[in-house]
UniProtKB/Swiss-Prot annotation:
GO terms for cellular component: cytoplasm. Keywords: Cytoplasm, Isomerase, Porphyrin biosynthesis, Pyridoxal phosphate. Its cofactor is pyridoxal 5'-phosphate. InterPro entries: 4pyrrol_synth_GluAld_NH2Trfase, Aminotrans_3, Aminotrans_3_PPA_site, PyrdxlP-dep_Trfase, PyrdxlP-dep_Trfase_major, PyrdxlP-dep_Trfase_small. This is Glutamate-1-semialdehyde 2,1-aminomutase. Pathway: Porphyrin-containing compound metabolism; protoporphyrin-IX biosynthesis; 5-aminolevulinate from L-glutamyl-tRNA(Glu): step 2/2. It comes from Idiomarina loihiensis (strain ATCC BAA-735 / DSM 15497 / L2-TR). SUPFAM superfamilies: PLP-dependent transferases. Transmembrane segments: none annotated. It comes from the Bacteria.
Length: 427
């Protein structure tokens, strides 16, 4: 028995399912989860001392790679000054100013502790601002585990086959309307029936929780137009895409300006952080200046702010994003070439430094339905073949991959060599 297997057995005694987030349990691929002990750059080391090229990046935050020296130093120096004060700090102001500079649609921003907190509060704020109860989300989009947002969700909920979680009262769920991602007509139909009751549309501008599915042409533009016509708030959930698919997130990449934006992952540099921000007129509805309440003991934590600020400063390095995009292109073009050569039906998607691949006969995957109809057995076999060769991918066919600035051309080539052997097991 490996050390990871021993730890998993032990963990299940004290922790539900042996994990603190469901997708980590390997239910989507079978077998026991790998326990990790350290990480550096593009690599992680497991409890048995095996090294892996990592394309999960802590589910998105590690865009610079693990243990980046500048982020680590900023974190250590901040920790020496105090782990938490529960008071305003100057670093909060600097973080807010930095976010506003990079994401122009954000005129004011509130820091919280997680992406779930950010989306939960953005929904509450939109309801308070509009005086309406209903919200519209998209099938397969995941916005954290708040009650009103777990209806037909993606990510771990989709991996486990339970997109509607028990424990959510019908009175909550009835206010959550769902449309089809990348199908603007489905949105128009809902708004034609009850547009004056809908407080907001919340969307992953690049769907990253049913693998990686970018928006089709006109989809985000259509959402902006519908919200303008009906007085609804447009919320971009950029917890995953923020600072990753482009310096200013998906709204920068696709040139669409939302009313509110939620952030997380990258802005913490690896520490637990979330944020929501947007138009001044909307943000001024949040307490203490407005009637919509939100609070948090550790919101704006000085150590997390220091880590995130250091990460954002590093992202301004000239050429960094171009390198990320080039690495993704090299990886995905290489994967497609090897899959085609092996006779394995597969297609790939990409958006900035996010990527995904689907085992399917379809020439492209643009919808939730297509993602769920892909060959899951092929994915499981491929996943374990890559794992054996020291390549760590997300243990679910419904999670995308993430490139970091620490990945080298050699890492990409080693990944492609491993993939060639893995594809051979599928024919």
């Amino acid at each position: 028995m490996s050390r990871s297997e021993e730890l998993y057995t032990k963990a299940q005694i004290s922790i539900p399912g042996g994990v603190n987030s469901p997708v980590r349990a390997f239910n989507g691929v079978g077998g026991s989860p790998i326990f990790f002990e350290s990480a550096e750059g593009a690599y992680m080391i497991d409890a048995d001392g095996k090294r892996y090229i990592d394309y999960v990046g802590s589910w998105g935050p590690m865009i610079l790679g693990h243990n980046h020296p500048a982020v680590l130093e900023a974190t250590l120096q901040a920790a020496k000054r105090g782990l938490s004060f529960g008071t305003p700090t100057e670093v909060e102001i600097t973080m807010a100013e930095t976010i506003r500079k990079i994401v122009p649609s954000i005129e004011k921003v509130r820091m919280v502790n997680s992406g779930t907190e950010a989306t939960m509060t953005a929904i509450r704020l939109a309801r308070g601002y509009t005086g309406r109860d209903k919200i519209l989300k998209f099938e397969g989009n995941y916005h954290g585990h708040a009650d009103s947002l777990l209806v037909k969700a993606g990510s771990g909920a989709l991996t486990l086959g339970v997109p509607n979680s028990p424990g959510i009262p019908e009175d909550f769920a009835k206010h959550t309307l769902t449309a089809t991602y990348n199908d603007i007509e489905s949105v128009k139909q809902i708004f034609a029936e009850m547009g004056d009751e809908i407080a907001c549309i919340i969307v992953e501008p690049v769907a990253g929780n049913m693998n990686c599915i970018p928006p089709v042409d006109g989809f985000l533009e259509g959402l902006r137009s519908i919200c303008d016509d009906h007085g609804s708030v447009l919320i971009f959930d950029e917890v995953m895409t923020g600072f990753r698919v482009a310096p200013g997130g998906a709204q920068d990449r696709y040139k669409i300006k939302p009313d509110l934006t939620t952030l997380g992952k990258v802005i913490g540099g690896g520490m637990p952080v979330g944020a929501f921000g947007g138009k001044k007129e909307v943000m001024d509805y949040i307490a203490p200046v407005g009637p919509v309440y939100q609070a948090g003991t550790l919101s704006g934590n000085p150590v997390a702010m220091a880590a995130g600020l250091a990460a954002l400063q590093q992202l301004s390095t000239p050429g960094l994003y171009d390198q990320l995009y080039q690495r993704v292109d090299t990886l995905l073009d290489g994967l497609q070439e090897r899959a085609d050569r092996a006779g394995v039906p597969m297609t790939t998607n990409r958006a900035g430094s996010m990527f995904g691949f689907f085992f399917t006969e379809e020439p492209e995957v643009t919808t939730y339905a297509q993602a769920t109809q892909c060959n899951m057995e092929h994915f499981k076999t491929f996943y374990h073949a890559m794992l054996e060769q020291g390549v760590y991918l997300a243990p679910s066919a419904f999670e995308g991959g993430f490139m970091s600035a620490a990945h080298s051309e050699e890492d990409i080539q080693n990944t492609l060599n491993a993939a060639e052997k893995a594809f051979a097991k599928l024919v």
